[in-house]
From Swiss-Prot:
Any GO BP annotation: protoporphyrinogen IX biosynthetic process
Reaction(s) catalysed by this chain's protein: (S)-4-amino-5-oxopentanoate = 5-aminolevulinate
GO MF: glutamate-1-semialdehyde 2,1-aminomutase activity; pyridoxal phosphate binding; transaminase activity
Compartment(s): Cytoplasm
Gene that encodes the chain: hemL
Protein's recorded name: Glutamate-1-semialdehyde 2,1-aminomutase
N6-(pyridoxal phosphate)lysine PTM positions: 265
Broad class of where this protein is predominantly found: cytoplasm
EC number: 5.4.3.8
The keyword Isomerase belongs to this UniProt entry's keyword annotation: yes
PROSITE patterns hit by this protein: AA_TRANSFER_CLASS_3
GO cellular component: cytoplasm
Subunit and interaction comment: Homodimer.
Keywords from the named record: Cytoplasm, Isomerase, Porphyrin biosynthesis, Pyridoxal phosphate
Amino acid sequence: MSKSENLYSAARELIPGGVNSPVRAFTGVGGTPLFIEKADGAYLYDVDGKAYIDYVGSWGPMVLGHNHPAIRNAVIEAAERGLSFGAPTEMEVKMAQLVTELVPTMDMVRMVNSGTEATMSAIRLARGFTGRDKIIKFEGCYHGHADCLLVKAGSGALTLGQPNSPGVPADFAKHTLTCTYNDLASVRAAFEQYPQEIACIIVEPVAGNMNCVPPLPEFLPGLRALCDEFGALLIIDEVMTGFRVALAGAQDYYGVEPDLTCLGKIIGGGMPVGAFGGRRDVMDALAPTGPVYQAGTLSGNPIAMAAGFACLNEVAQPGVHETLDELTSRLAEGLLEAAEEAGIPLVVNHVGGMFGIFFTDAESVTCYQDVMACDVERFKRFFHMMLDEGVYLAPSAFEAGFMSVAHSMEDINNTIDAARRVFAKL
């Protein structure tokens, strides 16, 4: 047995499923998950000594690559001053200033510890601000594991085939209205059925938890217009897309202005950080200035703030997003060319530093139904054959891939060459 296999066997006796987040268990592809010893740049190194070109990037945060010196040094320096104070720090103020400068729609921001905390808090705030209970989300979109959001969810919920989680009371779920991504008619129908009851829409601007599904041109502006028409708030969940699709996020890339924005992943530079923010009048409803309660022992943790501040300063440098786009575009083009040579039907969606691989005869993939019609079994074989080639993709047909600026064009070309060999045998 490999060392990964031995560790996985031991882990399953101690940790449910052997992992601390379900998708890591390789449930969606079969086999034994890799146990990682270290990472550097664009590469992961497992406990058995094998190196992999990494397109998971810790599920999105590692936009600069692993073990970036600026982030590492910031963490070391901050740790020397103490790990947690439970009191305000200067770095929290500097971090808030930077985030609100980079994302102009955020007049104010509240730091939390995860993307899930960000989305659940933003929804509570929207409900408190509007005095309404119902929310709209979209099939296949994932906004963390809060009860009200585990209804027809994406990410690991899709991987496990359980988009509606046991343990979520029907009384909670009844306030969550699920519409079809990229289908404005379904959203209007929900508003017309409950014109005075919907507090907010929460949406991934690029649906990255049913692989990678970009919005149709009219979709996000249409959501903004419907929220304005019916008095609801628009929450854009940029946990995945923030600082990756563009410096000011997908909202800037697609030209839509939300009332609230949720952030995570990149904002922490690899540390556990989330944030939510937006219009000043809405954020003023948050405790301690307003009645909507939210709190966290480790929110604004000095180590995490130092990591995030260093990361965002690097991400804001000229050329970062152009590099991400160039590398991702080259990978997408190369995969499509290699698949066509082998007669393999393939769609590759990509936006900025995100991409999605779909084995399908369809010309495009634009919604949940399109994603579910793809050939998952072929993806499973592709995943394991690419892993054997030293390429680490997301171990699920329903998760996006992530590029970093640490990837080189040589890494991209080596990945395409590996895919060409795999397609020939697939």
